[in-house]
Swiss-Prot record:
Residues 41-76, 136-137 are extracellular. The lineage of its organism: Eukaryota, Metazoa, Chordata, Craniata, Vertebrata. The keyword Heme does not apply. SUPFAM superfamilies: MFS general substrate transporter. GO terms for cellular component: cytoplasmic vesicle membrane; endomembrane system; insulin-responsive compartment; perinuclear region of cytoplasm; plasma membrane. This is Solute carrier family 2, facilitated glucose transporter member 4. Insulin-regulated facilitative glucose transporter, which plays a key role in removal of glucose from circulation. Response to insulin is regulated by its intracellular localization: in the absence of insulin, it is efficiently retained intracellularly within storage compartments in muscle and fat cells. Upon insulin stimulation, translocates from these compartments to the cell surface where it transports glucose from the extracellular milieu into the cell.
Length: 174
């Protein structure tokens, strides 16, 4: 729909409910980025204890004992840092994926990464596998890297010209 202008400016499109819903849905996915940067820190001791239990379970009753401190530190550092590696890796593929699938389908594909990552991280303790947690962190990092580029592109494409700048900044605010 167009709104006429009496002062000679070009007509502007109205903000519709569909536009608000589409922008809100797209930008809501960006919350995963900030959440997953910080969420790993609070349960550090619980995760380290789980790593130790997994280590002991794999060693058997005659194993050397609990996980060496250096190995635990390395596993913990990898668990935290792999998020950024996943984001960096996927950001290199952003252009290829967005051109291949289009913005909307690429965001839908990206959501499968988030679901898979959540499943891996959620089941890691039950499966006694710190590798699942690390892989899940890599995949959620890949999700975040793709979302950081796909969401602003998508919002910029669907937003009316006069609102493009304002709506484009919502990704950073989420």
């Amino acid at each position: 729909q167009q709104i006429g202008s009496e002062d000679g400016e070009p007509p502007q499109q109205r903000v519709t409910g569909t536009l608000v819903l589409a922008v809100f849905s797209a930008v809501l996915g960006s919350l995963q980025f900030g959440y997953n940067i910080g969420v790993i820190n609070a349960p550090q001791k619980v995760i380290e204890q789980s790593y130790n239990e997994t280590w002991l379970g794999r060693q058997g009753p005659n194993g050397p004992g609990s996980i060496p401190p250096g190995t635990l530190t390395t596993l913990w550092a990898l668990s935290v840092a792999i998020f950024s590696v996943g984001g960096m890796f996927s950001s290199f593929l952003l252009g290829i994926i967005s051109q291949w699938l289009g913005r909307k389908k690429a965001m839908l594909f990206n959501n499968t990464l988030a679901v898979l990552a959540g499943a891996l991280m959620g089941l890691a303790k039950a499966a006694a596998s710190y590798e699942m947690l690390i892989l899940g962190r890599f995949l959620i990092g890949a999700y975040s890297g793709l979302a950081s580029g796909l969401v602003p592109m998508y919002v910029g494409e669907i937003a009316p010209t006069h609102l493009r700048g304002a709506l484009g900044t919502l990704n950073q605010l989420a």
